[in-house]
Amino acid sequence: MKRKLLSAALAAMPCIALAAGEANTLDAIVVVGQRSAERFDGEDVGSKRLTAQRAATSDTASLLRDVPGVSLYGAGAVSSLPAIHGMADDRVRVKLDGMDLISSCPNHMNPALSYIDPTNVGTIKVYAGITPVSVGGDSIGGTIVAETPAPEFAAPGQTGLFKGEAGVFYRSNNNARGGNIAATYATDAFNITYSGATSAADNYKAAGEFKTFTATGRGTNTLPLDEVGSSAYKTTNQTLGIAFKGANHLIEARLGLQDMPKQLYPNQRMDLLDNEQRSLNLRYLGQLAWGTLDARIYNENVKHFMEFGPDKKFAYTAGNTSQGMPMKTEGKTTGATIKANIDLSKQDVLRVGGELQQYRLNDWWPAVVGSAGMGPNDFLNINNGERDRTSLFGEWEQRLSKEWLTLLGLRFERVNTNAGMVHGYNLATFPTAGAGGMMNQTRDAVGFNNANRDKTDNNWDLTALARYAPSTSQDIEFGFARKVRSPNLYERYSWSTANMMSIMNNYVGDGNGYLGDVNLKPEKAHTLSATFDWHAANRDWEFKATPYYTRVTDYIDAVQWNGTTNVARSPLLTNQFVVLKYTNQSARLYGIDLSGRMPLARTGLGELGLKGLLNYTNGKNRDTGDDLYNIMPLNAKLTLTQKLGGWDNGVELVMVDAKSKVADARNEIKTPGYGLVNLRASYTWKQTRVDFGVENLFDKFYSLPLGGAYTGQGTTMGLALPWNVAVPGMGRSLYAGVNYKF
């Protein structure tokens, strides 16, 4: 049935192709030098699309669901990890207001997009094909650029500008609730803006029973068979911005604050019970005689704490009711960027720039009083971790003729990583000789401490793009890219082979444990991609097709590891959670993205339209023949839209094929196909907007293909949890939101 639905969606896509102020913003001073760049811009989600989704989600990454080629790894409720063409997390560069932010957590519970509420997103652009070197770097999957609203200034002669907005929302399934407020005061040269948002939710319920146990390990506390344990959250994000404008120059400062007292995880052994982030972002932007100059310095500090949440067994030590398995992480990022757009001629633009980033990480697990296995000393997971990047790039864009536009770019990145010596719970010193120790902690620490941990990678990126527009209704963009990514600190420097420790180093949500390798090489990806764009001259209808092929040398995959013998496991264990070690192998990915929209009719019921999206990705390990982990199966979405006066409504049909191609080495869980129907409506009247809808209208049960393994309740400190239980999707949920602008 699901394949028939998907086939129908695929057949419908070509039909789309065949259908015949008072305030000044930053954009007013930055125009020259950008005209050609827009031709190679990423997919712009757009303010209308962003606004339409805000009432339905508190997860900023989910705003990208309708972008061709994008899927989402399931994680916490507000921390999904975007994947582009099958590559996610650190393989995708995510920039937030120009800052490169790094997850400071062994489970990557605090990704960059978790620090911005959907209501505070001004623009999001996704570079899912060939990424220009001016926005790429240290990534192989693509780039996501998210920005808060640009500062606005009063018109010349106006005494002052005061504006803002406030909103609230509610969602029924998990009792999600929250609100946001933003306010701006500006003159023609000064701007101060505050924005704040808070949201919280309880555990959500699936559309049916998906597990065979109710126990949580917390005494008599149990969860219903349809309740997804460890899916609740609470978070608050605030931003304060100050900007000064003079002639063609802008100076801007932004302070960001996050207080997240909890975000529970249904696919991790631990839960986030505190995350505090502070960021300071300073920027200069100017339009000069020769082009534009953009310079920025920023700093971020993160304090992160994990423990067993209320749905997971807490007490593993007799007599100690105050500690389960505490884990602390502190990360500090300092960065600087400078970019210049130089107008060489009316046809040529040269972009040059440089970037610096310094990242420091400490990840330690405090001793548990009275525990033989988790004491008497702190466990040093990553001690004084360092990851420093220095990069330079140059990019030449040339308009050869009215029909042809080309782009050629080269980027150099030098990445230095290092980490200090470590010890386990059993020692207070840093061993360089010895063996054994409970759970092989001494042996593993000795091997790590004696290894050469200071690594330097010299990485080269290359992008060549061309765009051909033979008519006003057709564009073809095609190109080649070489992209390189160096391993992150957890891939290189997590060191324990023990089950209990390794399962805490996992940011893919598959329930397994992971062990690093100090000798990992950078991943090197070579991509061919093209986009065929047919459209009306006024874009009333359009149809896009993007085929792509990527081959990755030294792809960081994983092999099953025997902690006792400290070698790769053979034969492989099946149908259970295991320990794996990161290793360099070879991979290839290919696929196609289809998207389009068309008007249907103008009737007394309003303007009717149809839009659609279809994605397909295939990923394979070329060394082992295994399928790559967490590849989204064939999926499609068709939406019937209606607009009448202030009404803007839609009926969505979401279709996902079965996930049958899975990574055998990781014992990845297969998921069946499904189809969902969502209803969405909004009404705008003057300064007020009301959004409401129903997600999963028919309360259909389904498992999330990229949601990972369910580890949301019970005794999670080991490998013995029930295997083959996928995290299910949410059952029927009604939502409503109101926003008022003043």
State where each predicted segment sits.
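Outer-membrane beta-barrel signature, preferentially recognizing the C-terminal barrel domain
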Residues: 270-289, 328-333, 381-389, 441-443, ...
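C-terminal beta-signal and adjacent terminal beta-strands/loops
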Residues: 207, 484-485, 558, 657-661, ...
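N-terminal periplasmic "start-of-domain" segments of outer-membrane beta-barrel proteins
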Residues: 26-61, 81, 89
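Flexible loop and strand-edge segments within Gram-negative outer membrane beta-barrel domains
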Residues: 231, 235, 248-293, 301-333, ...
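Solvent-exposed loop segments that connect transmembrane elements
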Residues: 206-228, 306-327, 364-380, 418-454, ...
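Short acidic/polar hinge/loop motifs at secondary-structure boundaries
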Residues: 101-129
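Gram-negative outer-membrane beta-barrel transporters
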Residues: 399-406, 414, 540-556, 561-664, ...
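Transmembrane beta-barrel wall of Gram-negative outer-membrane proteins
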Residues: 172-201, 212-261, 272, 276-290, ...
